Amino acid sequence: SVVPFYKLTSLPGNGNEMISELEGMKMSGYTMADITGYWEQDNENGTGFYIDNEGNVSDLTCLYGVEKYYSVKYHSAEVILNGNSCVISSLGSQWMVYAVGSNSLLAIDRNNNSLQVEHFVKKDVPDEMMRADEIMKAPVPAGLLGKWETIHYTRMINGENVTDIDILNGDDWNKQFYHTLAFSENHKISKWDRFGSQLYDQCFMLKGDNITIAEDLTNLLFPKYSYTETWTISDKTENSMKLTREQDNTTECYTYKRK
C-alpha cells in the first residue's frame, strides 16, 4: 500500500507564530534600541531586568506579600554592547544575547557551563520600576548634600519638653543622640556615631520638605512592608538645619551644623 505524504504547511499550537518571530530576530548588529525595556525570564518566577536608553540595567524580582510586587535593584550594571556582542549582567548571571526580536530575547548565561539558551519575554514596565526611576532621578538640592553634625536635641511629649540638650562630644550619656549624617546625589544617606563608626548606609527620597529614609529602595517603594522614618526640614540655612519628626504625641527635633 502507498502512504500519501502531505507537505507540512503549519505547525501545531503557536508554532507558526514562533517561527515567524524567529525569522525576524536579529542575531548580530545589536543596537541599544533593540534591548531597551523590561525583559522577564519565561519561567513564571517573575524575575527580569529593565534596560533604559543609556544601557543601565536594573534587576527586578517578584515578591509576594499581601499583594504581588517587585523588588528593584536600581542600576546594578551596564550593558556591554560591542559590535556583534551584547552582554547583560543581572542577578549573578552574564547573559550573552543570542538573538533579539520585538517581543523575545534569547540569551546564554556565560557563568553557566550548560550554555542553555534562555527565553525572555518583553513586558510592560512594572510600576515599581517607574516609581524607582522617579525617586532616583529626582535631584537632591545642593544645599542638602554633604555632612551634617548634630549639635542639639529636643524631645517633647504632648507639647512639653522632656529632653532639651546640647550635644557634647565628651558626654557619654549624650552619645546616644549624637550622630553625623551625609546626604549624597544618588539618594544614599550615611550615619555615623560620635566615634566615627558608620551605623547605617540607607536610602532616602524627598517630597517637598519631607525626607523619608529606609534600608533600601524597595523598602522606600513599599513602606507598609518595612520600617521607614520621615523627617521634616523644619528650618534650614546654608550651614544649619533642623529635622523634626512627629509620632503620636511625641515630637523629636535634631539641630545640625554643616561639617
Regions of interest found by a model, annotated:
Residues 1, 42-50, 56-116, 154-156, ...:
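Contiguous, well-ordered beta-strand patches that form the walls/edges
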Residues 3-4, 20, 37, 118, ...:
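Hydrophobic residues positioned within well-ordered beta-strands of beta-sheet architectures
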Residues 10:
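Extracellular glycan-recognition regions
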Residues 13, 21-40, 127-149:
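N-terminal helix-cap/turn-to-beta initiation motif at the start of protein domains
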Residues 121-123:
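Short beta-strand edge segments in extracellular beta-sheet folds
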Residues 156-173:
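Mixed-charge, low-complexity intrinsically disordered segments
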Residues 251-258:
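Short, low-complexity, Pro/Ser/Thr/Gly-rich segments in the mature regions of secreted, periplasmic
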